[in-house]
Amino acid sequence: MNHFDVSPVNDLTADLLFNLPAVQYVEGLTQDFPRRPSKTYLLYFKHFPKFMVGDIQGMAHAADLLYLFDAGDLDVRKLVPFPIDPNNWGPEETALKYKYMHMISEFVKTGNPNKGVSGLSTCDWPPFDPQRRSYLQFAEYPEVKNDLKGDRVRLWRQQIPMWIKQYPIDEASPNM
């Protein structure tokens, strides 16, 4: 398994707990678009930290906090309950940390994260709107993309409900 492979169980969990709710949330915040311009930005932190060891492959929940705060090793272990090896934190991780900290602090100060991104990369991150559905895929080289996990979001929102209607579960069935 290379570091870009993620298990189907992790994908399922990420969809149900993070991806689908995040997309639904930003859609709700931008429902008045274009009448009211969007000030909502969607970010997908796609990075595979070298300090994560064991079975965790990819950006685990709350691991982005290591890029946002100056936390020591003991604090990190309290914040991120995953096996880590702080000795694997290298220059790439430090550079990414400063990009992330700068971008988030710029967003907090101004409401627009682009000053934090444009000075450190070549992307222009537009606010989310229901038509373009833009988001920032944040990694060593940030990239603006559209329709976060679109196929999987459509699976959960359209295909699975359709299947449930087509193939209802018979509660009286002895096979259950």
Model regions and ranges:
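Substrate-gating cap/lid region and adjacent catalytic-acid/histidine neighborhood
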Residues: 1-92, 103, 110, 174
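Non-catalytic, well-ordered alpha-helical segments in soluble enzyme domains
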Residues: 93-118
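Mature extracytoplasmic/periplasmic domains
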Residues: 114-145
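Short, flexible active-site recognition loops that position polar ligands and cofactors
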Residues: 89-90, 94, 146, 150
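Intrinsically disordered, low-complexity, compositionally biased regions/tails
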Residues: 14, 115, 120-123, 154, ...
